[in-house]
Amino acid sequence: QKETLGKANEVLAEARDRSIPIIYVEVVRGERTPDTEIHHDITPKAGEAVLTKSRTGPFSTTEIDEVLRKQGIETLALMGISTSGCVLTTVRWASDIDYKLVVLSDCCADQDDEVHRVLMEKLFPRQATVVTSQQFLRALG
């Protein structure tokens, strides 16, 4: 997980340098605990949106769609822990409501490495462009 967070941090730093909007989504079911906090290696900076969801995906329990559309955002670059949970749900829902998607494969992780691999290689490419963090950063120019 440390390597995943390090790569995510590189992408976040470049996005900040380029003034690309960053939106964090945290999950809190019931009481807040240290396990529900955003990891200290990728802490949001001042002015970055942090939305709190109570379900697996962000679209059913947050105002994320409204926030994105108000900013004119049409393409989402996704990173997250729980490839088979949060990331999968976000890919499916966001695709259904016409967002263009890029999933950063090495900025996502799952408890089951094989499930992560299958999602990245077989399922996500049907609805998203799957790239590594380095490929994404190179594409930014």
List where the protein language model places each region.
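Active-site-adjacent betaalpha module
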Residues: 10-18, 30-141
